[in-house]
Regions:
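Conserved lysine of the Walker
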Residues: 44-45
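Hydrophobic anchor at the beta1->P-loop junction of P-loop NTPases
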Residues: 36
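Structural recognition of the conserved hydrophobic beta-strand(s) that form the central parallel beta-sheet
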Residues: 117-123
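Conserved P-loop NTPase "ATPase switch" module shared by AAA+ and STAND
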Residues: 85-102
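Walker A (P-loop) phosphate-binding loop of P-loop NTPases
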Residues: 40-41
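Interdomain motor-coupling "hinge/lid" segment immediately C-terminal to the ATP-binding subdomain
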Residues: 2-12, 123, 130-173
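Pre-Walker A adenine-sensing motif
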Residues: 11-29
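Short glycine-rich substrate-engagement loop in P-loop NTPases that contacts/grips substrate
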Residues: 58-87
Length: 173
């Protein structure tokens, strides 16, 4: 498990918090089970690592990617249980769809380790939807879209253009 901690610290060290996507402020980060879905390359991994870096205690958090070689030998549930016993409170699992039988293990983590919060990402919607265990009543789900033109301008030009909902635009606000 030490290799997971080492990899996590390295990833965190190389994560910039200069630009944070809009979805960050809309996520209920204190929910017990959070799913962040979106296409490959939209920034899900960066969003997780930025949140940890800005708001979490590193000694109570662990970021893992579900396709790590570690999981060829060890089960996700066993790793989560061991992490919890070491004082872990928040487990971030990236690319969950790459782990076989992921939904059953996440359900078991949720049901059997109530003191552990789980936040996971996934980009293969088909693999996520065919997960065997029903997580719909347990999870809060968010979708991270690709970069909007407004976000692009904010990043490239250093602007701070606000975001408006369709209702606000139609109302002329």
């Amino acid at each position: 498990m030490e290799t997971l901690f080492r990899s996590f610290r390295t990833q965190l060290e190389h994560t910039s918090t200069e630009v944070v996507r809009f979805l960050h402020d809309q996520i209920a980060w204190d929910s017990r089970l959070v799913a962040i879905l979106g296409a490959r390359g939209v920034g899900k991994t960066t969003l997780l690592l930025q949140h940890i870096k800005l708001y979490d205690r590193e000694d109570e958090s662990l970021y893992v990617t579900a396709d790590d070689f570690y999981f060829t030998k060890y089960r996700l549930f066993d790793m989560a249980y061991q992490f919890y016993n070491l004082g872990g409170k928040k487990l971030y699992i990236d690319e969950i769809h790459k782990y076989k039988d992921w939904s059953r293990e996440v359900k078991n983590i949720y049901d059997q380790i109530p003191g552990l919060q789980v936040i996971y990402t996934g980009s293969s919607i088909l693999d996520l939807e065919k997960g065997g265990a029903d997580l719909s009543r347990r999870k809060v789900e968010y979708r991270l879209p690709g970069l909007s033109f407004r976000e692009y301008l904010n990043i490239s030009q250093g602007w701070q253009l606000p975001s408006y909902s369709l209702e606000e635009i139609l109302a002329g606000k």
